[in-house]
């Protein structure tokens, strides 16, 4: 009896998080659920497994947010993390000569990339171009002075820049770290 009275509260809290989220986030989750149904009807095991893993990661992220709203940028970060996990697994399987598992992981990674490309977020190439412009401007501002990466991170307005560039702060940070050595040699 106690379990029945508590269960609706937990469900309502997670539903509130999803309704409190951005429209792009809600549309992406509903697209995943619809495609899961289609994959189940078509008996496409690889697509079904990949989408279930993605929905599971989304649900875990919603629980971890504890009432904060989610957006398409957090989905982008989550998809990036899932893709990097697949890449690591592929490298492990190649080292152990497990070609069957390599093909499975590659197929799941392709499915995740397809959904990642559908998000209304800037591409990695656009992010890299914007970061290059930003780092060039900071380099001319600094002149001959030696600049460290923490100073660059401090110069950036993290509240407005992700919305201007339509990307997540994590993607911007990764691009800055990647391009810092090339520009500030």
Swiss-Prot record:
Keyword Transit peptide: yes
Name used for this protein in its record: Altered inheritance of mitochondria protein 41, mitochondrial
Annotated source species: Saccharomyces cerevisiae (strain ATCC 204508 / S288c)
Cellular component terms per the entry's GO annotation: mitochondrion
Highest taxon, organism lineage: Eukaryota
InterPro entries named in the record: Asn/Gln_tRNA_amidoTrase-B-like, YqeY/Aim41, YqeY/Aim41_N
Family: Belongs to the AIM41 family.
Location(s) in or outside the cell: Mitochondrion
